[in-house]
């Protein structure tokens, strides 16, 4: 992560529920009060997903809380927001998402030079066995690190 990036929100559930493959960066089409709420950290990616319609990518289900100091022109909290990506990237992701078992999920939202960016990834759902296996590997790695720390 570079100096200019500030992570606002992460979708930890995506790492647990899916095996993440290719990652892409996408810009977001936002309204004025939405970017203000994002800068305050009032955004959730938990149940959001990416859909493709007519050669365009949209994020659905992303919750951005209303801006506290906004007036009656405040934004809709869960509206569909268009993603800004290169045409080739959208086509590649759209074709990959049509393959059975694959989907595109948001991983994190961050600010880069004052602009809100969304990191998305091509993902394949894990079954219960894979989730347990990855948890065991994580626990084993944690134990190794703990043992090494106590050794010195």
Model region roles, listed by residue range:
Residues 1-31, 139-152:
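Intrinsically disordered, Lys/Arg-rich N-terminal extensions and targeting peptides
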Residues 23, 31-38, 112:
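Glycine/acidic-rich beta-strand-loop module
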Residues 32, 52-54, 61, 120-124:
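Flexible glycine-/small-residue-rich
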Residues 53-93:
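Helix-adjacent hinge/juxtasegments
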Residues 78, 85-88, 126-152:
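C-terminal end-helix/capping segment
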Residues 84-121, 125-127:
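Beta-rich strand-turn-strand
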